[in-house]
């Protein structure tokens, strides 16, 4: 517990299927992902290129339902998975309704391969009963909106 927040760390990645996958570690460590970077990613983000890869266990968020249900309400979920947001949400349908708030980074210009569109991310959240209430932290490079963080609230 830190600053009144309760959290746990797990050495796994979240996506839409339970499996074992490559996790691509980029030179800029906070940009590492289950997704490979596009060839010219460094044009937009200088140190976002693959340095090495490791094999990692991948699970669906729903696998943590019991742990989620033990969390005090209102529950909040922070999603920042470097291009894997759509896949994570696809593997979370049904469990998302247990959260009141979702903080999510959404990319508009993909620097990762095989990502879902921002429109589909918004569609899943809308279908799960969430509405956008705030956006912040725009990342702009070379006059392109790369990503932005959003806060969604469960529409009761």
Set out the residue ranges of the language-model regions.
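Phosphate/nucleotide-binding beta-alpha loop and adjacent structural elements of enzyme active sites
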Residues: 1-156
């Amino acid at each position: 517990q830190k600053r009144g927040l309760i959290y746990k760390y797990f050495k796994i990645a979240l996506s839409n299927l339970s499996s074992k996958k490559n996790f691509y570690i980029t030179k800029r460590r906070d940009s590492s992902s289950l997704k490979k970077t596009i060839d010219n990613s460094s044009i937009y983000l200088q140190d976002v290129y693959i340095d090495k890869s490791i094999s990692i266990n991948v699970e669906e968020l729903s696998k943590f339902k019991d742990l989620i249900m033990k969390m005090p309400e209102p529950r909040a979920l922070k999603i920042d998975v470097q291009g894997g947001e759509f896949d994570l949400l696809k593997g979370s349908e049904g469990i998302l309704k247990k959260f009141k708030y979702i903080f999510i980074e959404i990319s508009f210009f993909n620097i990762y391969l095989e990502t879902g569109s921002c429109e589909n991310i918004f569609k899943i959240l809308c279908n799960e009963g969430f509405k956008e209430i705030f956006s912040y932290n725009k990342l702009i490079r070379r006059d392109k909106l790369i990503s932005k963080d959003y806060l969604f609230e469960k529409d009761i």
